[in-house]
């Protein structure tokens, strides 16, 4: 097993390397009859695309996506391109590789990168931009996430950068409307202005910063997830940890919950509308016992500082000789910025998988168990969010 796939019923396989001819993904298990065109996928890829500001890598990749399979359109569909229920293959060509930038490290391991571990495992490594361990691999995840969102009617998934290096946002100023107004996906306008100054200094020094990203899914129905080894939060944690450069994940209050007393941490309930309880808080991040509560699902993950920096660092060569390394090439001074849409995509893929798994195990949701207008269990042949022509 090569471990390049994740998910059970909504299954995603990614392929390709940073400096190869192309990368992409195959999504297997997407229900049929869902309208899908390349423009919808492209819109998500454009949010992650490199070279859009001075605060990201200046590698110029258009990330133009092609749908190779799994969709069909003719006069019977009214000209609409629909999913067919077969594997959806997506491809994104690499067009701005500069592999010569990496020739001086072909026989040297970069500290903080996966150079040594890949070679220790496989006996060979693609040193050009890190190969498959590069953050470029995440473009394929974002493409898959765009399809996953189509399986989640009534669910809104949003992400934000809430900390850069030691500089956190002020929660009192958290405003989702600000996320699209700055190059950091930051929900705090004042923090974004400070971060620009900080990151300019870091770039000038040839260094980098880490970050914390928060992803929130609203409209998630109760009942997703299965005890004990199919917990929703366990799958979310695994999905976020699989993103290159991620070093920590928390759900809800996460590690901060350890500092609370029991009466502070428990999310009290009162009678709500439609027979469902109303929660007075959401310390649990929308998941209890590994099963969604119907509240917003809240996940945060920490991204380490980019290891590709201009500061010389001690390392060794392939034949175990001491050397110093500095990394040339084009790199993100804070890779966490472009990790925001990646986190959203992984949230979408995990939720889509759990929606389909729930439907397969218990059928439709109990009455009132999902928001009005949502069809997470799929009540028509087209499945969740599907389109039934005619």
Swiss-Prot record:
InterPro entries: Chorismate_synth, Chorismate_synth_AroC_sf, Chorismate_synthase_CS
Coiled coil region boundaries: none
Reactions the enzyme catalyzes: 5-O-(1-carboxyvinyl)-3-phosphoshikimate = chorismate + phosphate
Residues that coordinate or bind NADP(+): 48, 54
Molecular function terms, GO-annotated: chorismate synthase activity; FMN binding
Uppermost EC category: lyase
Gene Ontology cellular component list: cytosol
Region of interest (Disordered), ranges: 362-390
Record: residues binding FMN: 132-134, 244-245, 289, 304-308, 330
Biased composition (Low complexity): 363-379
Pathway this chain belongs to: Metabolic intermediate biosynthesis; chorismate biosynthesis; chorismate from D-erythrose 4-phosphate and phosphoenolpyruvate: step 7/7
GO BP of this protein: amino acid biosynthetic process; aromatic amino acid family biosynthetic process; chorismate biosynthetic process
Cofactor: FMNH2
Region forming the signal peptide: none
Pfam families: Chorismate_synt
UniProt keywords, alphabetically: Amino-acid biosynthesis, Aromatic amino acid biosynthesis, FAD, Flavoprotein, FMN, Lyase, NADP
Biological function: This reaction introduces a second double bond into the aromatic ring system.
Assembly and oligomerization: Homotetramer.
Homology family: Belongs to the chorismate synthase family.
PANTHER family: CHORISMATE SYNTHASE (PTHR21085:SF0)
Record protein name field: Chorismate synthase
Protein species of origin: Methylobacterium sp. (strain 4-46)
């Amino acid at each position: 097993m090569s471990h390049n796939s994740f998910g059970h019923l909504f299954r995603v396989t990614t392929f390709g390397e940073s400096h190869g001819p192309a990368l992409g993904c195959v999504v297997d298990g997407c229900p049929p009859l869902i309208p899908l065109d390349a423009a919808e996928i492209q819109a998500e890829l454009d949010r992650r695309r490199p070279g859009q500001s001075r605060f990201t890598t200046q590698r110029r990749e258009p990330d133009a996506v092609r749908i190779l399979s799994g969709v069909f359109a003719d006069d019977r569909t009214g000209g609409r391109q629909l999913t067919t229920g077969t594997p959806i293959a997506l491809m994104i060509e690499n067009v701005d590789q500069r592999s010569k930038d990496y020739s001086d490290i072909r026989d040297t391991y970069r500290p903080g990168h996966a150079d040594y571990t890949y070679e220790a495992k496989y006996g060979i490594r693609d040193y050009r931009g890190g190969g498959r361990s590069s953050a470029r691999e995440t473009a394929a995840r974002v493409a898959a996430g765009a399809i996953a969102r189509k399986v989640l009617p009534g669910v809104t998934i949003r992400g934000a950068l809430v900390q850069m290096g030691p500089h956190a946002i002020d929660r009192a100023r958290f405003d989702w409307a600000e996320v699209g107004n700055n190059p950091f996906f930051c929900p705090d306008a004042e923090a974004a202005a400070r971060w620009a100054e900080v990151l300019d200094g870091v770039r000038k020094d040839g260094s980098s910063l880490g970050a914390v990203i928060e992803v929130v899914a609203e409209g998630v129905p109760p009942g997703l997830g299965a005890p004990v080894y199919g917990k929703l939060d366990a799958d979310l944690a695994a999905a976020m940890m699989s993103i290159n450069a991620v070093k920590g994940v928390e759900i809800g209050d996460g590690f901060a919950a350890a500092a609370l007393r029991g009466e502070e941490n428990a999310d009290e309930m009162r009678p709500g509308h439609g027979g469902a309880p109303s929660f007075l808080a959401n310390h649990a991040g929308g998941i209890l016992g590994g099963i969604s509560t119907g509240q917003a699902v809240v996940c945060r993950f920490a991204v380490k500082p980019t290891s590709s920096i201009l500061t010389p660092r001690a390392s060794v060569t392939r034949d175990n000789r001491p050397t110093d390394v500095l990394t040339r090439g084009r790199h993100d001074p804070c890779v966490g910025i472009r990790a925001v849409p990646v986190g959203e995509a992984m949230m979408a893929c995990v939720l889509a998988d759990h929606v389909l798994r729930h439907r397969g195990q218990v059928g439709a949701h109990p009455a009132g168990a999902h928001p009005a207008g949502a069809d997470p269990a799929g009540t028509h042949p087209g499945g969740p969010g599907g389109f039934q022509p005619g």
